[in-house]
A protein has these predicted regions:
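C-terminal catalytic "cap/lid" subdomain
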Residues: 1-238
């Protein structure tokens, strides 16, 4: 009888987790994250997207001063996300591809031989959250895990509004309303989870788990489908 392969899982790591401004802290984080991803990736097919964070915003800001177009600014952002993917992939070593796949199609091909597969951005106009969602839809993934620098989705930004409350569970309509409220679509903006990601996962009926990626024990739980602290976004597929 054929052995059933566990369903793939897709992780989107926010750039703010990868570049804090403190090289010693970032080195330790990359190393510990790579260890966790290697372990989970051996148990099931795992795809990871890496964000560009503050570094991407710095390059996009510089490009904007130089009068670059929005598409050119997005392309700068993509280069930074790919740099972060390369760092993580190189730490993991073969068979994880050292050169991050540049499209969803390339991810599918790479995953036939390696897990985890790490990539950055692909096309101008969205973020690595959107890439993670597109990959998940193509792979019929069990879930997307979004690792960020807050421990879930709040009613308002908890860094500025101490009274904001964390949602344990949201449906897609609620998350869509929050994303639309907080974004206008320019290059380098900071989204809770990007619009393309919300639309793609809602259509595909794939749940989203939002967790604090600084807590690698909790991140491991979210990746393995165990109980985790954070926000679960679910809803009926349309
Ligand atoms: P990020 O995915 O890092 O976006 O891509 P972000 O919203 O800044 O997320 P955090 O802060 O890392 O969590 C950085 C920028 O690169 C461009 C966009 O301009 C994005 O804002 N980008 C990225 C693309 O145009 N396409 C992609 O597929 C990925």
């Amino acid at each position: 009888m054929p052995r059933t392969r566990p369903a793939p899982i897709v992780l989107s790591v926010g750039g703010s987790l990868l570049r804090s401004g403190d090289p010693a802290r970032d080195g330790a984080y990359f190393a510990a994250l790579a260890t966790l991803l290697g372990r989970v990736g051996r148990q099931r097919p795992l795809v990871v997207t890496t964000g560009g964070g503050q570094t991407a915003r710095e390059y996009i800001g510089l490009g904007r001063r130089l009068g670059l177009t929005e598409v050119e600014l997005d392309e700068l952002g993509i280069e930074v996300t790919r740099l972060h993917a390369r760092l993580l992939a190189a730490r993991l070593g073969p068979p994880t591809p050292a050169h991050p796949p540049a499209s969803v199609r390339e991810v599918v091909a790479a995953l036939a031989h390696a897990s985890p597969v790490i990539l950055g951005g692909t096309e101008p106009g969205h973020t690595t959250d959107g890439v993670a969602a597109l990959v998940a839809a193509r792979l019929r993934a069990e879930a997307v895990v979004n690792a960020t620098d807050v421990d879930g989705i709040y009613s308002a930004d908890p860094r500025h509004r101490p009274a904001a409350r964390r949602f344990d569970r949201l449906d897609w309509e609620q998350l869509r309303a929050m994303v639309v409220r907080d974004t206008s679509g320019g290059a380098g903006q900071h989204f809770p989870f990007d619009r393309l990601g919300v639309e793609t996962l809602d259509r595909a009926g794939i749940p989203l788990r939002v967790v604090d990626g600084r807590d690698l024990v909790n991140l491991g739980r979210a990746l393995r489908g165990e109980r985790f602290a954070g926000t679960n976004v679910t809803g009926r597929a349309r």
